[in-house]
């Protein structure tokens, strides 16, 4: 059989019933060993060993915080935002960036309702959006579901009542081409958004699709953006920047839809009672929340809860700065006069984190002018003009009369 395959084959051994291994060479037995001896692998040997324990430590929290501050996902968009006029109509209630340094980004747009000339109103509206491209690409159902929760959570963090929220969804998807796998992406995303709407009793009014499609081998990523809007009074509006040291920082979150909405209701009750000083709807983790809240007034933060995952996404959760102690929310830390974010033993300065955050898109949307030099000053001399103290104008008028 081997010759038919052009292979050389030789018989080198025969399996027997005898429990011995016998080797012969040129008619002489050169080895005759018991199978039991072979099973022992020869004489037993002993040796002392020492294996040092290796520490599989995760990166320090401050190091991870610096990496997040310098990532595109968390980057400051101040250079882009400042290209638009946020004061048109003189009804703006919430500027795009808050705090003394104007560095804590607002998570919602709030403005007074337009009224007739001469009339005034305290009634306004607040609008926010939610979308995580990474989550949508990984799981369109979960990504769309979380987008709805995030948009509504931003309204709640701004002071609105989630029961009064309405939604509008905008979707982008690749060309479907009658391929079930491609059809599955918008199906899963819309199903996730619908489930979130049913859980929150928030209806979506209309929608928009203007960028779907594919070009050659390139597809738009699965995208569903949730826009949420709700009414609120001018005095109910909350901002995102931390206000003072020695304030408790609390987390309002739930693992189920019922727990999450109950947490929102507790937050709203505290806000109406005047106990909420500032708030942030969590998107990319608790660490990002306290970091961006600290930018505005350079108020520091010291973590007190070592169980939480500070960098895990928590769609729907709200971090709030409270002026009084409360027992029906999870306290995660306290504000400090030190200009640093401390997540355990290590910390990072607010100045360093803000610089990293600003630098990501500085080349694309600059916040500083590249020109240098002096600004030319313009001045005009005033002259005295003589005018009569008593006006004695004698106007003449021609009135044509026809009989």
What annotation goes with each model-predicted range?
Residues 1-403:
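Glycine/proline-enriched, intrinsically flexible loops and inter-domain linkers
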